Amino acid sequence: MMDKNAKIYVAGHRGMVGSAIIRCLEEQGYYNIITRTHKELDLCRQDEVEAFFEAEKPEYVFLAAAKVGGIVANSEALADFMYENMMLEMNVIHAAWRNGCKKLQFLGSSCIYPRMAPQPMKESCLLTSELEQTNEAYALAKISGLKYCEYLNRQYGTDYISVMPTNLYGPNDNYHPTHSHVLPALIRRFHEAMSRTSLM
């Protein structure tokens, strides 16, 4: 259990999951929550991330920041998705470790599991066969973040955990017609269809 006075950094606080984490923490009485916008702190820049962690020394970190998108975005910008996600993950996780962060929660993705994994999917399926090609770059970046946390735990005794959300939607989600995930895209289409129907 975290102390109510603990300094908590939520990376990705403007996104769907990050904003939900903030709401949950505030509802539970945590008030010493640190956030930074992308303009204030570029997580892909190691020097900026190191300086931030050295100055703030957060005790707990929720790493929900990521470059995300649906199948179209993932398949059109493979290099961008891999580079940006790997850079921000490694920078934040490494800076947290170097600055004595007590616990870190890394937000992974269900796309890290093989395309043809048996259902229901088990964690042991990780790295057993091919990934889905349309989001392979994103998946590889997320696997790298998960493994880096695992290796820090094994080598240095840190308490860094990875969680894999599946099919999320909610406030602050991306409802773009071609660059969102399945559920928000469907919600948008339903809403647009209902709006057109009510105008008739």
Which positions does each model-derived feature cover?
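NAD(P)-dependent short-chain dehydrogenase/reductase
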Residues: 116-125, 150-200
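N-terminal Rossmann NAD(P)H-binding glycine-rich loop of SDR-like oxidoreductase domains
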Residues: 5-28
